[in-house]
Design a protein with these regions (language model features):
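Gly/Ala-rich beta-loop-alpha elbow adjacent to hydrolase catalytic centers
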Residues: 12, 16, 20, 47
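Helical cap/lid subdomain of alpha/beta-hydrolase-fold lipid enzymes
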Residues: 24-184
């Protein structure tokens, strides 16, 4: 389908959402300028680990260079409207007793490395607090796992896609957290 605005919605899962934040920037990265904000008007980040106590060097660099929703309308500066991007963060909130054995085994260490709390809430890999980027429209989906190996419903399950896609169709009203009901 042709986009009526000439721009696209970028969707990144896990670290892909963090890397797409870097793609939006027009500053050089490893000798190349991407300026993805000229092509996209929305960035959806699914279970993306934006913050962590033990973050990789690349993730730390993205957070230092492009803190929060850097190109959003909420940034109070003189950026031209063409450079503005809507950020939507989607976090799963998985009940670990109902999750896969892999999620039950990995989640405590992953959560501790990210937030410092092994009993945090999250999608089995990324805590909710890490997945919700400051300044973004935030969607928390109960019962949603990081990937298919973590639970039956994950960000790419058709019923779950419908849930987070609906957030894109709502008018942006600020840095809202939208908690959806359990995904069937």
């Amino acid at each position: 389908r042709h986009s009526p605005t000439g721009q696209v919605t970028l969707i990144g899962h896990s670290s892909g959402g963090v890397m797409l934040r870097l793609f939006l920037d027009d500053a050089p990265f490893q000798g190349r300028c991407y300026d993805g904000k000229a092509l996209a008007d929305t960035l959806v980040m699914l279970g993306s680990p934006h913050t962590a106590l033990r973050a990789t060097a690349l993730r730390q660099m993205v957070q230092q260079r492009l803190p929060g929703s850097f190109f959003s309308d909420r940034v109070g500066d003189d950026r031209v409207k063409a450079d503005r991007v809507r950020y939507v963060s989607v976090a799963g909130d998985l009940e670990l007793p109902a999750a896969s054995s892999m999620a039950r085994r990995l989640a405590p260490t992953a959560y501790r490395n990210s937030s410092g709390d092994a009993n945090d809430r999250g999608d089995g890999l990324v805590p909710v607090t890490s997945a919700l980027l400051e300044g973004s429209t935030s969607v928390v989906l109960p019962g949603v796992a990081h990937g298919g190996a973590f639970g039956a419903n994950w960000y790419g399950t058709p019923a779950v896609v419908v849930e987070w896609w609906c957030a894109l169709e709502q008018p942006e009203t600020g840095a809202d957290t939208v908690a959806k009901g359990p995904v069937a």
